[in-house]
């Protein structure tokens, strides 16, 4: 099992004025602990389940650039980008830019977006769910076309691009790592089967999302995709009461049903080094 650190909270004991040095120290410690992936949320307000919306939150792609400058080996991406927050060609270019500047370490995690409160508050359009999924599929198509050698026009129902030029191309070939987050059985997992390198599923109360994997397998059969070509990743939440042994045991259970990577995030922990300590302990337990 490969462990990732998912940073979902920037309200740390060190305070907002010290976020830069604290974040740099946090990601360096994570990499030194053997953590192979580092991700951030793509939100502008804190999520209600993790803290008050007024708590500190940093923009994802500027933050990934900062993290890339303070790490050397870890793979980096948003977990996950809301499709409605950026024009797809801008998103593709942002990921390409970070991929090049990081030496091929930055990928794209993306989903259909859901946070209506945040969108209404900041003036982002929040279309109905069916349109958000249409935007998601077209965004996936645009990104993959821009990350290829094609400069042909793109004609979608929502987006039209006259020339999909993206120079320089990403270092990662054939394209940056592409993960789709969410477990929606009709649309999300179908898009995973069609376009993605990886899926990302939540773990609720220790229950393994094995049914979602069965659904993904059926979608792969429908579209002619090799199910084993898709990486299966999961989320693990830890609290102040969590132990390295507990995390390692849950990760072992996930590995037993086909997951190869897990992203660990904190709930109610205001000292980021405590999160790294738990993950380090889980890694040491194998």
Tell where the protein language model's regions lie, with residue ranges:
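An alpha-helical appendage that flanks or caps ligand/catalytic pockets
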Residues: 7, 29-31, 36, 130-174, ...
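Glycine-enriched alpha-helix->loop->beta-strand junction motifs that scaffold or abut catalytic
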Residues: 34, 70-73, 102, 191-199, ...
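Short, acidic/polar
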Residues: 17-30, 91-94, 181-194, 242-255, ...
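Internal, glycine-rich beta/alpha segment that forms the wall or movable "lid"
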Residues: 50-51, 78, 84-195, 210-222, ...
